[in-house]
Amino acid sequence: MTRLHAFNREQLLASARGELFGTAAGRLPNDPMLMFDRITDIREDGGPHGKGMVRAELDIRPDLWFFGCHFIGDPVMPGCLGLDAMWQLTGFFLTWLGAPGKGRALGCGEVKFTGQVLPEAKLVRYEIDISRVINRKLVMAQSDARMYVDDREIYSARDLRVGLFTETGSF
């Protein structure tokens, strides 16, 4: 089977429903927690570590759900949502590789916020660079990531970790 190297919003939402890779595969969150509109490129051997990479985008609109509640009179995208998008994309990479299980964020080494996403912004871009993949009893990916708003880097994270688990009852 040939793997796709880009995904539109409908395909990403199909992943949330278990229709893209099957019901045993990891799923992306559904709206409103899906934090990107498209994956523009995903590769098994790309990125600076040569272990894989994902590139994705989110169109910014003033009517996005989080601007109405965070904060009233001072709308800004919560930083944790950008960080969660990085975990979502790292987990999607594992599922795209064909690993089974439910995705869970396992932590990160370092996170830096040096800017913000305001309603007047146009585009958020994510760059995820996979640094390690373990595919044994434990299925896990580790990545370094950056988030840009209108081509300005505003978030970075090192050593993001996501695992896929076939049983989550004791997690």
Curated annotation (Swiss-Prot):
InterPro entries: FabA, FabA_FabZ, HotDog_dom_sf. Pfam families: FabA. GO terms for biological process: unsaturated fatty acid biosynthetic process. The active site is at H70. Its EC number is 4.2.1.59, 5.3.3.14. It catalyses: a (3R)-hydroxyacyl-[ACP] = a (2E)-enoyl-[ACP] + H2O; (3R)-hydroxydecanoyl-[ACP] = (2E)-decenoyl-[ACP] + H2O; (2E)-decenoyl-[ACP] = (3Z)-decenoyl-[ACP]. GO terms for molecular function: (3R)-hydroxyacyl-[acyl-carrier-protein] dehydratase activity; trans-2-decenoyl-acyl-carrier-protein isomerase activity. Keywords: Cytoplasm, Fatty acid biosynthesis, Fatty acid metabolism, Isomerase, Lipid biosynthesis, Lipid metabolism, Lyase. It is found in: Cytoplasm. One of its GO terms (cellular component) is cytoplasm. Pathway: Lipid metabolism; fatty acid biosynthesis. Necessary for the introduction of cis unsaturation into fatty acids. Catalyzes the dehydration of (3R)-3-hydroxydecanoyl-ACP to E-(2)-decenoyl-ACP and then its isomerization to Z-(3)-decenoyl-ACP. Can catalyze the dehydratase reaction for beta-hydroxyacyl-ACPs with saturated chain lengths up to 16:0, being most active on intermediate chain length. Homodimer. Belongs to the thioester dehydratase family. FabA subfamily. This is 3-hydroxydecanoyl-[acyl-carrier-protein] dehydratase. It comes from Stenotrophomonas maltophilia (strain K279a).
